[in-house]
């Protein structure tokens, strides 16, 4: 009935950092996201991280976060296929299109193309889907105004330390794939929009009945409550690796969900403390 994944793998980390805790009610209300606490449980003061543990005003080991981990483990064990606990994100992603899954709670719009492919068990003969995207559910600690999910902002990054001429060339190239003509074609192929004009284009209105609610979602103001990873996270790679290792320990039963999140809180605070002492974050 339910599809998920639970293998000890980096993808288990973004299963949680991509806003699972916020759906349970971890993090503060309002936009921009994460003021003062975000979905990683990290609290900021004067735009600098001040801690993620409850004792430091954070939320990564608070009641909502522990509830979120418990609910994930319960659903994985009670409703997902037996093999799901040993799958990675990449292995679990194609399974719903095989037609044996009732819901997939952790859903990226990047899955839409395979789920809308004609001739698959999840698409009707007329090309309309047998499934529908639904608003993210939220847990008992959630309050109106909190975020309810994650979406990548799809930004381009140009490094200051790169060769100046190469950086200029990269900037020029970026103008092409983000141009209106190209971005609309990309939206039709990958179904991950970057422009409002693409979302509102008449060609997407024509395709909307075959995309299971994708177009309607992006035309709705509610999309603002699905936000990107905010600026509270000072070192994404270094902190992200802490998540999948600690979550995996709870999945296998090595530790309880509360212990897993307590350990994560301590490790995150330790890393952020080192970053603070190193003075690498600069001024606001």
Annotate each predicted stretch with a short phrase.
Residues 97-107:
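Alpha-to-beta junction loops
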Residues 129-141:
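A structural supersecondary motif
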Residues 23-86, 136:
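Glycine-centered hinge/linker elements that transmit conformational signals in sensory
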Residues 3-53, 145-159, 238-248:
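Periplasmic solute-binding protein
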Residues 82-98:
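Short helix-initiation/N-cap motifs at beta->coil->alpha
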Residues 165, 255, 259, 266-284:
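Conserved N-terminal structural module of periplasmic/extracytoplasmic solute-binding proteins
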Residues 109-125, 140-245, 276-284:
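C-terminal lobe and pocket-closing loops
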Residues 67-71, 165-177, 256-263:
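Short amphipathic alpha-helical coupling segments at ligand-binding clamshell hinges
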């Amino acid at each position: 009935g339910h599809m998920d994944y639970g293998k000890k793998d980096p993808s288990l980390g973004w299963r949680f950092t991509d806003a699972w805790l916020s759906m349970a009610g971890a993090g503060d209300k309002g936009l921009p996201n994460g003021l003062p606490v975000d979905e990683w449980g990290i609290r900021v003061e004067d735009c600098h991280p001040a801690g993620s543990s409850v004792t430091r005003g954070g939320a990564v080991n608070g009641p909502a976060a522990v509830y979120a981990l418990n609910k994930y483990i319960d659903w994985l064990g009670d409703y997902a296929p037996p093999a799901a606990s040993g799958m990675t994100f990449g292995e679990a992603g194609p399974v719903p299109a095989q037609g044996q899954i009732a819901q997939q709670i952790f859903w990226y719009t990047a899955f839409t193309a395979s789920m809308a492919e004609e001739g698959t068990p999840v698409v009707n003969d007329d090309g309309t889907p047998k499934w529908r995207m639904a608003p993210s559910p939220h847990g008992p600690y959630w309050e109106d105004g909190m975020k309810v999910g994650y979406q990548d902002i799809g930004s381009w990054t140009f490094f200051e330390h790169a060769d100046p001429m190469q950086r200029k060339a990269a900037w020029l190239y970026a103008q092409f794939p983000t141009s209106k003509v190209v971005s609309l074609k990309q939206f039709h192929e990958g179904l991950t929009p970057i422009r409002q004009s693409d979302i509102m284009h008449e060609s997407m209105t024509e395709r909307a009945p075959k995309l299971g609610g994708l177009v309607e979602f992006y035309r709705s103001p509610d999309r603002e409550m699905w936000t990107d990873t905010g600026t509270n996270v000072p070192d994404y790679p270094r902190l992200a690796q802490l998540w999948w290792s600690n979550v995996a320990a709870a999945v296998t039963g090595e530790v309880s969900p509360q212990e897993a999140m307590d350990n994560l809180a301590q490790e995150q605070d330790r890393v952020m403390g080192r970053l603070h002492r190193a003075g690498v974050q600069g001024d606001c």
